[in-house]
């Protein structure tokens, strides 16, 4: 995939940079693997806003992607590579020898007609899915399970991958993109390769309307609100807020550590490093 630029015929095309999807499937998604996508629009079951600035957006159908990859002892052929509005990377429709079809996450360097497999003792090849214990050190992988049989949880976004750096007994040492090194059970499944659409990070939306198509609503700064609406609100004239940046509920917005999961701390070998400013 490459990037697509536009001539500045209008204000909305000036500076716009999008991903070129000309090489993707142009038809409708596979009907048996789609369902209605009833997005919550940032509301909970009581209708109250729990995630601000979400709502609207173009109507979408949810593509049921198989993150488990548990169909073994069969070879699948890639029928097509598709755009998925529900995630940043592309997906691929594969057909197995018994005619069953699945949606999988599409890695880079894969093309229509390629053959892929799931299971143990198979070829180290882009698109193949196997246990961590069968993957050599230094290979890029994605869609990694945290618990055997629980389905892929790590490295599922566009252009992402993680790397096996070593082995410790029944565990593999996996280095995340953040720099964190984590112990994962060697029986967990992972897929070879780096995920597709790495240029996603380089796009420029170009206009407010495209954000609304994506379901992103306008964001209002707290400092311009009233005191009843935000801790930074109020003041005579233009003020700087008068306190350290916080969220509308008063939680620090600058580097407060919110992780509280002592149960899995023992699996983290090295913490991620913060970016130097």
Specify the residue positions occupied by each region the protein language model found.
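Beta-strand/loop nucleic-acid-binding surfaces
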Residues: 99-111
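Structural recognition of beta-strand segments within beta-rich domains
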Residues: 86, 94-96
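Basic, glycine/proline-rich low-complexity segments that contact nucleic acids
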Residues: 1-87, 108-277
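Short acidic-glycine loop/turn motifs at beta-strand connectors
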Residues: 96-99, 177-178
């Amino acid at each position: 995939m490459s990037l697509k630029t536009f001539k500045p015929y209008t204000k909305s095309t000036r500076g716009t940079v999008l991903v070129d999807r000309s090489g993707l499937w142009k038809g409708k998604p596979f009907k048996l693997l789609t369902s209605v996508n009833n997005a919550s629009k940032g509301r909970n079951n009581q209708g109250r806003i729990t995630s601000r600035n979400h709502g609207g957006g173009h109507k979408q159908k949810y593509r049921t992607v198989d993150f488990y990859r548990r169909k073994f002892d069969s070879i699948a052929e890639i029928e097509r590579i598709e755009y998925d509005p529900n995630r940043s990377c592309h997906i691929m429709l594969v057909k197995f020898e018994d005619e069953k079809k699945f949606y999988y996450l599409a890695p880079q360097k894969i093309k229509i007609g390629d053959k892929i497999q799931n299971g143990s003792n198979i070829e180290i090849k882009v698109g193949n899915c196997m246990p961590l214990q069968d993957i050599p050190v230094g290979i890029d992988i994605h869609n990694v399970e945290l618990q055997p049989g629980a389905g892929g949880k790590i490295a599922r976004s566009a252009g992402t991958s993680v790397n096996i750096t070593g082995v410790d007994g029944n565990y593999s040492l996996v280095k995340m993109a953040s720099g964190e090194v984590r112990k994962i059970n060697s029986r967990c499944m992972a897929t070879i390769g780096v995920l597709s659409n790495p240029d996603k990070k380089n796009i420029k939306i170009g206009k407010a309307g495209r954000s609304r198509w994506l379901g992103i609503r306008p964001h209002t700064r707290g400092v311009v609100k009233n005191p009843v609406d935000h801790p930074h609100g109020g003041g005579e004239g233009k003020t700087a807020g008068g306190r350290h940046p916080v969220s509308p509920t008063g939680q620090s917005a600058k580097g407060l550590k919110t992780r509280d999961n002592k149960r899995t701390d023992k699996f983290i070998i090295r913490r991620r490093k913060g970016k130097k400013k």
